[in-house]
Amino acid sequence: MNVFAALQAAYPADRSRVAIETDTGLLYTWQDIERATAMLANLLTSLDLHGRTLDDGTYLPPVVAAHTDKSVEALLLYLATLRAGMVYLPLNPAYRQAEMDYFLGDAQPAVVVCAPGDFQWLSRVAFQKRVRHVFTLGTDRTGTLLDRASFMSDQHRPDVFESTSLCAILYTSGTTGRSKGALLTHSNLLSNARTLIKHWGWRPDDVLLHALPIFHIHGLFVACHCALLSGSKLLWLGKFEPQAVLQHLPQATVFMGVPTMYSRLLAQPGLTRNACNGMRLFVSGSAPLLPSAFADFAQRTGHTILERYGMSETGMLCSNPYRPADGPRLAGSVGPALPGVEVRVVDDAGAPCPAGAVGHIQVRGPNVFMGYLGMPDKTEESFTDDDWFKTGDVGKIGAGQADKGYVSIVGRARDLIITGGFNVYPAEIEDHLNQLPGVAESAVFGVPHPDFGEGVVAAVVPQPGAHLTEASLIDQAKQRIANFKVPKRVFVLAELPRNAMGKVQKNLLQKEHAALFGASPR
């Protein structure tokens, strides 16, 4: 079965029920979803688009690229693309000309959909890349896409195609080089969605408060698939605003967010047990959740955040338990591997590490992507001979009574700092710094050092009203950790640089301080 067929199977018997309600008061029924996706799918198929065969023989259907702001219609475009048997490519609407030049050249979409205000410059880039069709889509249900679709029939029989057919391309963040397009199949998305629906206890009477962007796996695949494929209602916010979330929480049962969202909610006095009285689940992902935020949220609301672990190439692969009978939700851990997914930790030689030892995280299962678009060598080096995907993350699997089988992420392998021959894992140092009085959060990274190879550097954000000094922070760190782990320099910043999903961009910090110790990059 493909993703759209699974959606149709999840329609409630009464299609006049509301499926999506927006923060502006718009209501979309399940029948509206059926009709709108049919009309959009008919438009796409009327364009006589053609796919192509990749170098490895895989057929890539026509690609529809969406560079749009968040709207229900943008979600319907995604569903219609899958209904038409095509491939959906979501792109961050913040991307500008140079970035879009790369993505459109690499993915070679047949269709680009953009915000009306971006049409002039983006259509020029698109046509230079031989894109055949460029449509516009506004957040207020305007644009040429909907204008053209309005003339189409609202009846459409989805094509019959295999679950192994490609249906989406997700580009990785590309913090260490050019972004890679992960090729995902219907089977990848559907297996992951069904696992999460069962593991997190989704039911038709759930209401998901959706405040995430939809150009990312978290907001588009995890959040929307869980709700729609379980017949649940979406309460749709155009963007994340703490006050708007608090206003709508009483109408919801599930909320998914990134750590930055939770820290901003914690800054609101209105975040109380009473405000969360009807909630059954808060999920966090896309970046590590600070243990202090985990504890503060539980104390304020009576709810323990469920932290999970996933990536563009694999969907979700680990999750803390939902049901208390399955185990506790632990701070600083992403939980055990999801049912049907295998996760292991190996050393540099590829041999399995003993429980509790730090190593490289690898994953295998039906959720794992097919490969990287146009990068056969990168695809080959990312998998072992027995099909384990190398995530690039470093972590460990718990061995204690409380955390046995639970995965903890230490950091990215590329973030490992080797100073004077010793390995330093930034997450460990950050954990110690974050426990110091007055510290809100920190980021630890390495830069070239003429003597040690790399020097440990920290960027620290103070709590409101706190006065932090570099000397004091270094002195306190020396009392907690071995000297080779102590940052040689500490910078106190108003905030850490982050991407759209709240991940700290350490590459920007490294670039800014690359010449700090006067050594040349290796």
Which sequence ranges carry the predicted segments?
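Structural core segment of the AMP-binding/adenylate-forming
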Residues: R83-R148, P464-A466
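Conserved ATP/PPi-binding loop(s) of AMP-dependent carboxylate-activating enzymes
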Residues: Y322, P336-G340, A349-S382, F422-V424
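AMP-binding/adenylate-forming catalytic core of the ANL superfamily
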Residues: G365, M370-G371, E381, V394-K485, ...
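Conserved AMP-binding/adenylate-forming
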Residues: L26, A41-Y95, N423
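Conserved pre-ATP/AMP-binding loop-to-beta segment of ANL
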Residues: R15-S16, M152-Y171, G177-R178, G201-V207
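Conserved AMP-binding A3 loop
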Residues: L27-Q31, C167-R194
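Conserved AMP-binding/adenylation subdomain of ANL enzymes
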Residues: L190-V207, F215-V254, Q268-G270
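Gly/Ser/Thr-rich phosphate-binding loop
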Residues: A252-G257, L266-P328, E342
